[in-house]
Swiss-Prot record:
Gene that produces this protein: vpx
Protein name in the entry: Protein Vpx
Superkingdom as given in the UniProt entry: Viruses
Reported function: Plays a role in nuclear translocation of the viral pre-integration complex (PIC), thus is required for the virus to infect non-dividing cells. Targets specific host proteins for degradation by the 26S proteasome. Acts by associating with the cellular CUL4A-DDB1 E3 ligase complex through direct interaction with host VPRPB/DCAF-1. This change in the E3 ligase substrate specificity results in the degradation of host SAMHD1. In turn, SAMHD1 depletion allows viral replication in host myeloid cells by preventing SAMHD1-mediated hydrolysis of intracellular dNTPs necessary for reverse transcription.
Lineage, top ranks: Viruses, Riboviria, Pararnavirae, Artverviricota, Revtraviricetes
A GO cellular-component term linked to this record: host cell nucleus
Alphabetical UniProt keywords: Host nucleus, Host-virus interaction, Inhibition of host innate immune response by virus, Viral immunoevasion, Virion
Length: 112
């Protein structure tokens, strides 16, 4: 007899589960971007997205969803570290940062 934990629950197929996962990923990336702009400089967010895309998609040949997943992990870590150090952004705002001169990179999903 096979292990019952290995069966797919009734009414669920692999396609529905995968589709739901992609929807969750897209929704979560947009949500974290909307929250991140309250705490991190936009240019930093854009640079993380651009570098994630360049490295994971262009250099490593990974899928768009994989790039979004890796970007999500980086942004979660950045927000965690920011809040751990004592977030005062909503009350005081951001001080001027030493960001690179020139035009900003294209916006990540949900911030266009």
């Amino acid at each position: 007899m096979s292990d019952p934990r290995e069966r797919i629950p009734p009414g669920n197929s692999g396609e529905e589960t995968i589709g739901e996962a992609f929807e969750w990923l897209n929704r979560t990336v947009e949500e974290i971007n909307r929250e991140a702009v309250n705490h991190l400089p936009r240019e930093l967010i854009f640079q993380v997205w651009q570098r994630s895309w360049e490295y994971w998609h262009d250099e490593q040949g990974m899928s768009q969803s994989y790039v979004k997943y890796r970007y999500l992990c980086l942004m979660q870590k950045a927000l965690f570290m920011h809040c751990k150090k004592g977030c005062r952004c909503l009350g005081e705002g951001h001080r001027a940062g030493g960001w690179r001169p020139g035009p900003p990179p294209p916006p990540p999903p949900g911030l266009a």
